[in-house]
Amino acid sequence: MKLPALSLVVTWCLFLTACSTSQKDFRPDRKYAPEQLKKDYRVFRGVLEAWHPSLYWYTSRDSMNYYFDRGYSQITDSMTEPQFRTILSYVIAQVDCGHTSIRYSKAYSHYLDTARLRQFPLILKFWPDTMVVAANLNRRDSVLRRGTPIASINGRSPRQLTDTLFPYIVTDGYNLTGKYQYLSTGLHFSSWYKELLGYTDTFEIGYLDTAGVLRQTRIPIYDPRGDTVRRSLGRSLQPGTVQRGPGPAQRMRSPGRRARKRRELLLTRNLQVDSASHTAFLTLNTFEHGYHLRAFFRHSFGVLAEQHVRNLVIDVRSNGGGDASLSTVLTRYLIDKKFKLADSLYAVRRHSRYDRYINNGFLYSFLTFIASSRRPDGKYHFGYFERHYFRPYRNDHFDGQVYILTGGNSFSATCLFAGALKGQSNVTLVGEETGGAYYGNTAWMIPDVTLPETKVRFRLPRFRLVVDRQREKNGLGIQPDVPALPSAEAIGKGLDFKTARAKELIRLHSSGQ
């Protein structure tokens, strides 16, 4: 979630001051001396203690001091960057803030983006006590197909694996749905399995066959350098090519910049209307700038009014947030009463002795000076959002039935949107708990901090937000009104079970049930 209006200024200034990292002398296996690591760790702790407004929101000061001391005590020998990052990740996860996370140095991130490294071969969908194959990188594997329940990996059950990995994964409060979704996304599970348990050349997999019988199989690690099938597919099916019978691929003209942008916009936000059922489906995967969302919302709700749409399904399952001003625009087309974004929104300081480690620290301090004022409690409050009420739009306001699809990737500004509408008589939240907290979060201005020796980075949110003091501060996300949970069968068949549940609710409502 970002600071409205000022975020474009931040982006432009970051662009002007950005610099590239030289890769000439980079070695991924480089080890840093204990003295270097301890220096970085002291900066890491000092910055968080000085700046983070929610360091003790969910974890007591005594407990955080214990975790800080524990991490420091683990630096007894030289370490590689991934080893040091693992220590930092464990400590920062105890803050219970989903916007505060560790990032590799720019050099190491570039290495990971370009290196073809070995990976755990299964992409898994996680939920409590369950792992199910969502994809298999070893394409020739005919046993562990999509939808296969996994009982164990090298003798470790789903519960044992998540108990091992979860302490290193950041989340808002005590939310576990976001952690399950994180492990289910991309190569996150593979990466943390490698760091904490280590890769082996083969993995012993316990799985359930189609009859529900527990069986065992052994699978090799996935090595992209030896995947001749994918290499051949990559040559023949790469963008801008077409295969015309035997022989090498024939290159066609690649799509132009405008065509690529149109495709990106379509994948990021789109509206589809089913005139037969008077139902519209709005997919929205971000609230970031750069996707013309204001114009998209204006056009979309104009279409809904023109076509007399009665049911609107809004899919924000993959929406990790963005600018709160844009989520507010969408909210105003749907909400039936005036609302505020914040009961309280504040930073704890404008300057500290650690400013030199904060990327563009002067700029962020300047923006904090402009946006906030000091109150008697000693905090720097963003008074506009604490006082201002937003009202529903009159033109093209949608008053039909609204179904909002949510899940573990629904985060930050998306939770402001869903939370503001939860409980409204014509709004139903369908799916899973959001990954972001219902009570509030810590975000708005989020610079990176770069540690001086290793150049490891971490995100430092500057403002604590409490949306509504009347909400329970239980560390959980926004709960769905109608749960729609995953199953091995749905994953195996590639079913969109949340959209299907929303359609069923529309049918029941239309028939008066």
Residue ranges of predicted features:
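Bacterial Sec-dependent N-terminal signal peptides
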Residues: 1-27, 44
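Conserved acidic, small-residue-rich alpha-beta core segments centered on
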Residues: 148, 324-491
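Flexible, low-complexity junctional segments that flank or bridge functional domains
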Residues: 20-312, 316-346, 438, 443-450, ...
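Generic N-terminal initiation segments characterized by hydrophobic and/or small/turn-forming residues
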Residues: 1-5, 11-13, 34, 264, ...
